[in-house]
C-alpha cells in the first residue's frame, strides 16, 4: 500500500500496480475487520479465486495478459484458466465450512490458507498484507474517505 498516494494522484498510474494494491487492501480489510468484530463472532477472510476467464478481462490486451502470465504460471511453467466452478470453490469453502468457524484475518487460495509469498509465482501472501498496523491505518483512511 502506498498510503501517501492511494489514488495515484502523484504518481504514474499503472493498472497492475493498482490491481495489486486493491488486492492488498482486501487482505488488510480482513485483518482489521476480524480484529474489530471477531469478538462478536464476525470474521472476515480474503481469497484469491485464481485466474478465471471472465468479462473482467475484456479491456486487457492479449499483450498485457501475456506480460503478466509469467507471474501466474504454475511450478512447471504452465498456465491454465480455471473454470467458474473452480474459481468459486475457495469462496464457497470460506462461506460454508464449519472448519473455518471463528477463523478470520487470513488469506486463502486453492481452498487452503495461503503460505508466505513466493516471488515470481503470484502465490502466497506477503507479510505486509497481514500487518495489523497497516490494516488499522487503511481502515482509518477508509473512514476519512467515506466521511468526505
Predicted regions mapped to residue ranges:
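C-terminal helical subdomain
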Residues: 22, 70-123, 130-137
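Short glycine/proline- and charge-enriched loop/turn segments
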Residues: 4-12, 65-72, 117-126
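Non-catalytic terminal and boundary segments that flank Rossmann-like NAD(P)-dependent oxidoreductase
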Residues: 1, 126-148
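Rossmann-fold NAD(P)H-dependent dehydrogenase/reductase core
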Residues: 1-65, 144-148
Amino acid at each position: 500500500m502506498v498510503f501517501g498516494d492511494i489514488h495515484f494522484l502523484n504518481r504514474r498510474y499503472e493498472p497492475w500496480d493498482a490491481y495489486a494494491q486493491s488486492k492488498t487492501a482486501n487482505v488488510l480489510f480482513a485483518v482489521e475487520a476480524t480484529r474489530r468484530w471477531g469478538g462478536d463472532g464476525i470474521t472476515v477472510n480474503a481469497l484469491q479465486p485464481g485466474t478465471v476467464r471472465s468479462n473482467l478481462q475484456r479491456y486487457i490486451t492479449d499483450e498485457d495478459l501475456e506480460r503478466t502470465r509469467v507471474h501466474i504460471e504454475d511450478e512447471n511453467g504452465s498456465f491454465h484458466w480455471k473454470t467458474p466452478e473452480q474459481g468459486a470453490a475457495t469462496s464457497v469453502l470460506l462461506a460454508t465450512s464449519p472448519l473455518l468457524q471463528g477463523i478470520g484475518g487470513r488469506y486463502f487460495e486453492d481452498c487452503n490458507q495461503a503460505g508466505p509469498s513466493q516471488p515470481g509465482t503470484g502465490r502466497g501472501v506477503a507479510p505486509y498484507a497481514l500487518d495489523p498496523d497497516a490494516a488499522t491505518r487503511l481502515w482509518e483512511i477508509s473512514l476519512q474517505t467515506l466521511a468526505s
